[in-house]
């Protein structure tokens, strides 16, 4: 397989325009899902990936399900098999782990439902709760006092959904 880290950041708008001032990821509106992203991914897919029987997963911070479907829909336009999103990890933060907010279970559930509804029958979704960017999920969404129970609960919640577990 092949993992394409923060792949949605490889296409930037021309002219180096000024960014909207926000506390994190300044300028993201100019490089997240930029104007040539699909073109670049299509070229990489056609010239390299299509020559191998391989699984590809992209990472797309702050991407919508509708944009993900542009890349993973199972037809002749497909350039990735699936893509990581981070929406479900924003149940206790704003855009990034550095701006903490109280945990919001309803927000997390709405996020999972939104992605399930969008991807169902059109593309394949990724299932994960932590990675190198977002470690220690039991400490974050569970209880250290009940770490075994928390781990089982989080794993059950994650892995009984439709998608590929990571």
Language-model features and meaning:
Residues 1-166:
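Active-site and adjacent substrate-binding regions of carbohydrate-active enzymes
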